Structure formats: structure tokens, C-alpha cells
Amino acid sequence: LNERSTASTEAVRRWFDLAVRELRASADILDAINVFPVADSDTGANLVTTVGTAAQAVQVLETPDVGELISLAGQAALDDARGNSGSLFAVWLCAVGASLEGRGLTADAFAQALSSGEVRSWSALTDPVPGTMLSVIRDIAAVQVPEAEEPGSKRTLLHHMERVVAAAREAVLGSTEELGALQGSGRVDAGALGMLIILDALRRTAAGEGSGRPVLWAGAPEDSAEPTGQETGVQVQQLLDRMREAAAACAAEGTDLLSGPAETGVEVVATVELTALEAASVRFELTEIGRSVITSPISQIEGELWRWRVHVHVDDRQAALDVLCAHGTPRNVAVTGLDPEGSGRQSRVNPSDLD
């Protein structure tokens, strides 16, 4: 390993650690404002769990390739993803990592990776809805790399990340009007806000803010651009503070921050071995009986056979399990209640019980 590779992969580990800490610190806010696709108050918990899985994975994975490390972290996160937000983040992370494999993390490479993340995330959902985490993913992919700067430099990467986080923040603010359930509330989408927290953690890691440890970039060693993200960080924190104050005020009054659409039933997530054709069939059949269907490949097994992660909201958990069992043997199955009384109550399904 050369020194730069070691520094960069170490910085990836720092990014996930920081993201988990920041998500955990804001989990109560994310849970309180969670309204889409169902107001089950678990966005914060789901993101902490999913990103936490990625953070644990990178601590034991060994590779000098930043992209491969991110890709493998994404696969681990996707295999254990929770909720709509956790599943979409993991799908996005897999695509970003795959795009960066064999490349240094420059502004151009990062921009291309964000485009890959947009394509895969939007295609993973049967019915993508703007005004959510998807809008953040869409808008950051549209950010142009600064033209009047040296290609491949640390300064260009940092400035590009500044723009990416700024675009993410605008997308979060725009969710108030873009997502029907939020219109007129003055609140923002929880998944979108969670994605902003993760992206700002990446920006801070890349800039080495508050740390003398390695920064995440692939420029020349002599390129010592100073971090320029203090204002961006303040704006992100101000938005979090605003949501926290709103949640606290409602809690003091004994009222709900948002009254989201009532929904009963359960969330079913599972991993199953499928070909692309079988995955398409599973997606169609789950769409017929459920909502919020997400399907995305995790990793190739051999030939046309891949491991797929599947997410769906259904009224009858057995109906979803029957669809999966008709095409393969579901593994790592988790079922979580969506109704107000059952929300957050998760049960694991033993594969032997499905035979």
C-alpha cells in the first residue's frame, strides 16, 4: 500500500464513523419528522442501523482501493438495510463505490459516481417519489465540477463537495413543498435530511475539519488547500436546530409534529438469490400486493445469479414471504410493524420456517 491509499481508506472509515455519530445525535429529530412513506417514526433508527453496518464493515475489510471499500461497505449495508431510507442509502452507496473502483477520489470521479448513484437509486424503486431522499440524490448528481480550478486538485474536490452539500441542503428545504404530505407544514423530509447529514460528514472528512488525521482525496501531496466549508457546516446545523426546536415544541404541547398518512401492515425486508428476470418478476408480484417496493442487486454469485435485497410494505407479511419463497429462499428476513402501536417492533424470520 502506498501512503496515499492508506490515508484515503482510513478516511473512508472516519467518514462512516462520523456519519453514524451525527445520525445518532440527530436520530430523535429524524424520527420525529418522519412522515413518508409512512409516519412510523423510525427514519433515524433505520439510518443509524444501516450506516452503522457500513461503518462496522469497513473496520474489518482490507483493500487499498477507496472505491472498492465503499462498494463493499454498501453491499454490507444493503444486506442489512432497514426501512425505505436505509435501503435507498445503501443502494446509492453501492453505486457510488462501484463507480469509484480503480480510481482516485477527484472532483470529476466523484461527480460521475454521484450520477451513477442517481441512476441506480431512482431505478430501485417501483414508484419513486420526489421530495424525499431521492430529490437529494438527484440534485447532487446535477452539480457541476468547478471549471476555473486545477483538475484533480484537493481544492477542486473540496469546492465541489461544498456545492454538493449546498445542493443537498436546498433539496431538503424544497421537500417542504415538493412532497405532498409536507406542504404547508414548514417541515422537511426525514430521509432527505438524513442524507444531508451523511453528505456533510463526507465533506467534513474530506476537508479534515477538526482533525489532523488523513483527508479523503487523491490530489498531489503538495496541494494543501485550506478547508472552506465552515459556512456550509453552520447552515446544516442551523437546519437541524430548527427541526429540533419544532419537535421539542410539539412534544411540550403533547401534539404530533406531523400527522402523516395512517398505514397498517408490516415492512418486510429480505435477501434472496435471483436472476435479473426473477428479480423483475418478484418486483412485479410485490407491487401487486404491496407498496414502497425496492429491489436492488447486492453482489454476483455466479453467472446470472445475484444476491438481491428486497423491501416492501404489505398488509399481510405471509403474502410477501410467499412471493419470495416462490422464487428462492429468503435470508436475513426482518419484519417490522408499520401501524402506530406496532411501529418499530421488529421480528426476525428463521429461514428454516420458510421451507
Named regions from a protein language model:
Residues 1-355:
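N-terminal loops that bind phosphate or other acidic moieties
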